[in-house]
């Protein structure tokens, strides 16, 4: 406890985190893209290469997953306006939201129904391509739908994939790996929902369950993979490949906005609110958004009050050297996808200059907003996916932040507030009814 007091003396906001108060922190270390980019260690070329790789796999995905065929084998989600929800939030919280609120429906992405369909599927495909190219079975000019043939399934069955997950990453990696032909093991933490485990098993995936939290599941997965040279471990805490899979979202969103005639520039700022667990998904997406929109996009991460790992790591500068458990927080939250106690050190250090801020919200707040969104817009999400929904209000109420950036009323009135809905499209009906019953 004495150490916590010392930490609080140095970093006063820790007191609110320990008290499980809903907290908003605006990052005083935020820089321009030009200043912050060198610290990421990845470039626009890296993201373009990821984009090209996904294009090579498009014919394969279109055939392997017919639900992607209409989009030409591209796994992408809709952006929709949510005016009724915006009004409801204003009414419930008595705070005007300037500008327009939109929802990015990664919750309804093909294949696995969450943001993890971006990074998880991309890393599995990257590994499959590498193995097939090295074995001389494939060239980058081939039609990748050839990977569906029995010969390739046979080839890939010699290899295995392992991952640790609270649920959604395991789903995307499990389903994709099984489709390619890999043997796959998903190490699931105690928070993982039973239906996610059942869905994986129905795809022939081995699920190993732990009574402990996310960090333990990842560690065990890493250990199990080390003993097998043919086993590839997908490392949610440190993977650059996962990060790049998420980053592709930036250019894609830019294209969607162009199609909708939506302007993002200095007079029309874009605010994006991303739920954050270990940090790979929101970190990668935020990186891609920064490359696409430069200094006109402002990214915020949202975390449960019981799992504020990235806020704690970035705010104190201790990154993965501190966990929420170190300050007496239990890491128990209904937002199972965000139940992470120790943030990715790679993501924290890469993105600490490119984030405008982080905030926390209570489980009950997520349940309330989950119910309102279902009532007002007919869109059903899992609790984690509502974390971003509290963002627009926090920003519109934060005059100090607005002044620091010199935002005028006109700019705020022209703003777009994009809430990134991270999952929920595959939640079973009975489970969803339970979520809805918990809202006020």
Swiss-Prot record:
Cofactor(s) named in the record: pyridoxal 5'-phosphate
Enzyme Commission numbers on file: 4.3.1.18
Record GO terms (molecular function): D-serine ammonia-lyase activity; hydro-lyase activity; pyridoxal phosphate binding
N6-(pyridoxal phosphate)lysine: modified positions: 116
Catalyzed chemical reaction(s): D-serine = pyruvate + NH4(+)
Highest taxon of the lineage: Bacteria
UniProt keyword list: Lyase, Pyridoxal phosphate
Example GO BP: D-serine catabolic process
Pfam family, one: PALP
Lyase listed as a keyword: yes
InterPro entries: D_Ser_am_lyase, Ser/Thr_Dehydratase, Ser/Thr_deHydtase_PyrdxlP-BS, TrpB-like_PALP, TrpB-like_PALP_sf
Quaternary structure annotation from Swiss-Prot or TrEMBL: Monomer.
Recorded family membership: Belongs to the serine/threonine dehydratase family. DsdA subfamily.
Protein name: D-serine dehydratase
Species of the source: Salmonella schwarzengrund (strain CVM19633)
Native organism taxonomy: Bacteria, Pseudomonadati, Pseudomonadota, Gammaproteobacteria, Enterobacterales
